[in-house]
Amino acid sequence: MQDSPVGVRFGDYVSAFTSGGTIAAAWDRGEWYRRGYQMGMEHRGKGVDVQLGPVVGPLGRNPKGGRNWEGFSPDPVLSGIAVAETVRGIQDAGVMACTKHYIFNEQEHFRQPGGFEDFGFVDGISSNVDDKTLHELYLWPFADAVRAGTASIMCSYNKGNNSYACQNSHLLNYILKGELGFQGFVMSDWSAQHAGVASTLAGLDMTMPGDTGFDTGLSFWGTNLTISILNGTVPQWRLDDMVTRIMAGYYYVGRDKTAVPVNFNSWSLDTYGYQHAYAGAGYGLINQHVDVRGAHGAAIRQAAARSTVLLKNVDGILPLTGREKFTAVFGDDATENPYGPNGCSDHGCDNGTLAMGWGSGTSFFPYLVTPLEAIKSEVVGKGGVIQSVVDNYAYTQIQALANQASVALVFANADSGEGYIEVDGNMGDRNNLTFWQGGDALIRNVSAICNNTILVIHSVGPIIIDEYKNHPNISAIIWAGLPGEQSGNSLADILYGRVNPGGKTPFTWGQTESDYGPDLIYQPTAGHDSPQDNFEEGVFIDYRAFDKKNITPTYEFGFGLSYTTFSYSGLRVDKITAGEYTPTTGMTKAAPTLGNFSTESADYQLPANFTYIDAYIYPYLNSTDLKTASMDPEYGVDVELPAGSQDGAPQSRIAAGGAPGGNPQLWDVLFSISATVTNTGELAGEEIPQLYISLGGPDDPKVALRNFERLSIQPGESATFHADLTRRDVSNWDTVSQNWVISSYPKTVYVGSSSRKLPLSAKLDFGGY
């Protein structure tokens, strides 16, 4: 298995794909599937069985969350559809997808125990979330991933309601495996397992290194798992269940037929070296340098361009022609990292153009086409003049060049990543929502002089840019996100009109940081073993929070301009006969046991002449006495185990369950929605009509996204938008009945071009449901 959600981590001759948080802006099922399939093919070509991605945790509760860029969107429906298509793509390529991080993993600060005793804590942060918010927000995209057949789910570092996610029986056994009917295996994040038997019985199926410390050879499992089975603490059926779940995923994606031997090494790009790097063992051929990229560069260029969002375009200044009298390019973000595109470990720096965040969710760039080189190629090829200043702090030179420019392209960025790397004082999470590397001063310097300034943003999420939206000299603003290896080419395709922008922002751009509601916890209060993060806002994050508090955003969720214009008309709602919702009833079968095994500890001793590799974890015993073999001073001490977790007898089925993703009737289509979208401009373009619903209750969002479709329309022509509303789409989670219910509140559907531009609406008739 291998990271990452944007490509094969540590591999050479691999692609650096557009990030999840950027390609979400394409709002295109086909684009998400293709990206998943291409990533899957590259992992498969390198010999990887499990791709550690995609990501829907973090969902994006706060825009400063360090790993938001690895996921898709703070909207659960947009994220849910994107993750489902990505899972299908990865697994159709013959690789198991590992959807992560389950669940409530919404910030990097304090995600793991240790290192913050000064605050009075010894454990990782606890995300405290109510049942309604769990189901209607954070669990929603995981349910979509399960329904799409994800072979694996990774549990997260944090606690959920004061129980670590990787030993939280309610979240793993009851919700994930019970209610959602997850058939695959749950694996821990690295160092996310904090107990042995408790994790086993709570639903953890596979552990990753670091549970007791990296490179120690010690584990809560290994020898201890063998002991817990021999002494009866862990029943046989649970071991069989763990193995079955792992192998089910293996066969489900056809690894028995499509597996490729591993042909690279995570710890070295050298051709020859140690297969077991830490132990210094197994010297030989470790890297065959297999090129798995195929034609993916062209696909990445297309995906990044189709994910680019045009936020401002005064008087149609864009697209440019390349024949402007004098093109000036400003900013470190326009050019290359002086140390090379892979010059910082896990991309843990902000040097040069930003095309990927930092951390374990990264991959090496095979190359990185910078904006400056792509723009220069465009302008020079058409006989134009182009000059640049890429030092953000060279104010004298910046002002001199801005005075000459007929068009000024200013590049600025904001980065984030995983918490084990600190960049410019940002420990994974962003400290604020401003530009990095003096970006704001750069923009102000140029725009104060050049009255035709175009701002290009590469960022992990929203930035406070209201000043620039309203600046008379800033003619256009483009958000290009984290586009991957084809950054410059995809941007040039937009700037010079080869691609008509059609992306829509997958998050809200606020006027101030406080607009977003609860902040991340940077300075926790004492009083508990863990910092306590109470998700008191419930389902009201991002645009839902802005709507609830009547805050006007700079740019609303779903917003994006085009070089053409569109109109909406002819909303139609057709009611579909689906019958009444029936809760799942009955009993499960007893947990099966598969064969027999020896209970004699002598049969599990380290085999004679066994070649032991230092710091590797093995299941063998070093003594026939289980207590001695465990090396656990608390062996035999009674501990509290998850209630019912040792009981393999038939269990009552969960009313909201019954199939992967939940009760299968949740996906009954109750309404079919259609509308006409007309291209009223002079250029062919793509529009993304969006379907929202008001569920009508006092505790419901004003509107919530439920569906969308990306349409390609020629000038003067129309296309029909089609979208279904399922039972789940029109339901609320009822905490009393523990099921989805359609409330009696009146419900309205809306169709339009963004969450705040919804010209079409209709009431829904629920008679018969």
Question: Where are the predicted features?
Answer:
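Glycoside hydrolase catalytic-domain context in secreted enzymes
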Residues: M1-G648, G658-N732, Y745-V751, S755
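Short beta-strand elements
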Residues: K757-Y769
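A glycine-anchored, Pro-Gly-centered beta-turn/N-cap motif
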Residues: Q738, S743-Y745
